[in-house]
Amino acid sequence: MSNPDALPFLTEMTVADIISKQAKHGVSFNRRNARWYVHLLKEIIVNIDRELIPLLPKMRLDGSTYMKPFKKSGALQKWPQAYCDRVGLKREDIGGAFTCVEYVDFDPSKDARVKEALMDEGFLPPEFNVSKKPWNTFEIKKDMRKYGTYQAWYTAWMRGNAKQKQTAEMVDADIKKFLEKHFRFKTKNYMKAYVFGLGLNPNRRNPVTFDEIKKALATSNKWPTAPTNLEETLEEGLGGELGSVGSLLKRRVVAAHRLGLISGLIAKEREDGKLSAEANSCATPTFRFKHRIVVNIPSRGLFGHECRSLFESDYNSDSDHSRPFVITNVVPDGCYIRKGTNVIYEKGKPGKKDKPVGAYKYYIPAGKEVFLGYDGSGLELRMLAHYLIKECRDMLAEAIEENNPAKKALAERGLASAIMYRDILLEGDIHSHNQKLAGLPTRDNAKTFIYAFNYGAGDAKLGSIVGGGADEGSVMRARFLAENPCIAILIDRMTEKAAQGYLIGVDGRKITMRRDATGKVMVHKALNTLLQCAGAVVMKYAMMFLNKWIEKDKVRCAKVIDMHDEGQFSVNRNDVQKLKEHTELCVKKAGEYLNMECPLASDCQIGLNWMHTH
């Protein structure tokens, strides 16, 4: 019997070798432009601060406490006198022991202060860092439903056995600390943010009560501490509408992030003017890459294009690169070149504007190679379509074998909806389809919804897409699953399989499931884990096929970046067409090799730097 782990093992070894060569070769980095962008970002931050700081409340700083501020002569001691001189107090203003208190201008560089100010302005963070609590919530939830209110539950447990009493005391003490920190002397908007973080809707008609807040805290062992993924959240436009102050804060947060990112890249530059695009190809439970140095490079938003443009093709001193030349991109179906411009536009739907998707021609200076990038086209949704069909077919086969008519009917209905989902994905507009099924107001909402859904977002996160909370998210989830029986089948089957502690990937590898603090398998992450792993594995096989073809045809190129579902190359001008043909077929070949139920495809773009190719 062949070893089922042999193929995945050899795959990971081959991929690790390819990535090792990529890191050693490095990606060319435009240090000159990077330093200029650092200067521009500092100017932007200074200008924002000049407008922003006067609009924000001053920060209170508590200093030392002086129990004996006076000398025997009656004059102030050295440090109390220094404090009085600094804040403008006179000797006669001091009557005895005191604590130094100062009010200084708001400091936008302090992350915690900025988060608090954003929440004061109405920002509702969809994601929070959490602190884990030691109690088991199963019994608490059961009894909370029984008693109805937090106070009734607390009273009952205080009269219960020793373990219940100890737990109730611990829960109540922690709740009091939480309320003191986040609900005492805080603005209404700030409190709304933490209500939202607890999965409650702060904007509903009937206000949220403190009993509901206490119940939410008692029945969860993960409490929100501070907003996380702030830059990403603000860039995606999540978290609700912000006023003028909030918008300035948002712009400053993003600018500071870009400044830190580019400064960090400059510090990592090698002597040869390149950056090592290192990655551990097998460092996560889902077998996705874990990157170093070249990581989380934005492609849109403030200075997003500028960040990507810093990664360029290599210099080449060969004679065939001695002159500048112009490369031409292919105009995709449904796109056109706007008259009098060099911009490719995608035709919008009725009532929608056409949007620019890239340039038609690029000027390549003398001595420079071409930058070429490819990525998996609609990869995550194709992975979803594959598993929808596969699991419904497996369920149908089981039903026939078991002679179970009810199970067979459900499987047939699920398979029909799965095949329809795949057909719309390949030939129609899947996001408009998802918009209709989930009852969402816009197509953009649908795009955000399906990716959040696939990544295992909770009801609160889903609800935030339409400006609501956990209740709205729960309704959207229920409606989407009801309209897609195949997705409900997939989730149920994966949840059941994940309970054993692992899932089986597309190439037969075991995917170890994450566990919580108590050691319990986190089965609610099964779909997210499965889809992430499938996408990562497919792109690894595509990488191997591509590498094999490159070596066979002796294509003069070097792989310089690999980022999840995309790969970037620096390629000799005369070999661009060869490499382009291979990149457009490698993902399709990987799908066929792995017997995917949904055909796979890849897109390829060429240019001078990473901004042009993705």
UniProtKB/Swiss-Prot annotation:
Domain of life: Viruses
Pfam families in UniProt: DNA_pol_A (PF00476)
InterPro entries: DNA-dir_DNA_pol_A_palm_dom, DNA/RNA_pol_sf, DNA_polymerase_A
E.C. numbers: 2.7.7.7, 3.1.11.-
Nuclease among keywords: yes
GO molecular function annotation: DNA binding; DNA-directed DNA polymerase activity; exonuclease activity
Cystine bridges: none
Tagged with keyword Transferase: yes
GO biological process: DNA-templated DNA replication; double-strand break repair; viral DNA genome replication
Catalyzed reaction equations: DNA(n) + a 2'-deoxyribonucleoside 5'-triphosphate = DNA(n+1) + diphosphate
UniProt keyword annotations, A-Z: DNA replication, DNA-binding, DNA-directed DNA polymerase, Exonuclease, Hydrolase, Nuclease, Nucleotidyltransferase, Transferase, Viral DNA replication
Function according to Swiss-Prot or TrEMBL: Replicates viral genomic DNA. This polymerase possesses two enzymatic activities: DNA synthesis (polymerase) and an exonucleolytic activity that degrades single-stranded DNA in the 3'-5' direction.
Protein family according to the UniProt entry: Belongs to the DNA polymerase type-A family.
The protein's name in its UniProt record: DNA-directed DNA polymerase
